[in-house]
């Protein structure tokens, strides 16, 4: 059976243990919810670009009233824009992670 003095000693020993830091030396943890907002903004941008491009290409299809051929590039252009935007945002995020959070 554990008495009160032993429980107090165990609690004091647990409080004196160093905290575990999962970040490498010199790297500061990201502040509160700022990182989540940054990632949500990037996700919105990455999803909005292809949708906007598809809308523009769709309106071009309806206004021209002509048959679409695979050589028009109307399907591949939004995908290319989305991939390029996603790659650019990932590159910018990597740079800001190295330099410290600016958002």
Swiss-Prot record:
- Annotated membrane-spanning segments are 42-62, 73-93
Q: Which UniProt keywords apply?
A: Cell inner membrane, Cell membrane, Membrane, Transmembrane, Transmembrane helix
What membrane topology term does the record carry?
Multi-pass membrane protein
Keyword DNA repair attached:
no
Q: Where is the composition biased (Basic and acidic residues)?
A: 10-20
One Gene Ontology cellular component annotation held by this UniProt entry: plasma membrane
Region of interest called Disordered, as start-end residue ranges on this chain = 1-34
Full protein name = Putative protein YmfH
Which classification does the entry list for the species?
Bacteria, Pseudomonadati, Pseudomonadota, Gammaproteobacteria, Enterobacterales
Q: Which gene encodes it?
A: ymfH
């Amino acid at each position: 059976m554990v008495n009160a003095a032993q429980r107090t000693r165990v609690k004091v020993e647990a409080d004196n243990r160093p905290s575990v830091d999962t970040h490498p030396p010199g790297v500061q943890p990201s502040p509160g919810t700022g990182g989540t907002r940054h990632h949500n903004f990037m996700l919105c941008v990455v999803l909005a670009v292809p949708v906007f491009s598809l809308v523009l290409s769709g309106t071009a299809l309806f206004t021209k009233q002509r048959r679409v051929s695979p050589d028009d590039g109307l399907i591949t252009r939004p995908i290319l824009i989305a991939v390029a935007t996603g790659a650019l945002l990932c590159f910018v995020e990597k740079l800001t992670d190295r330099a410290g959070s600016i958002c």
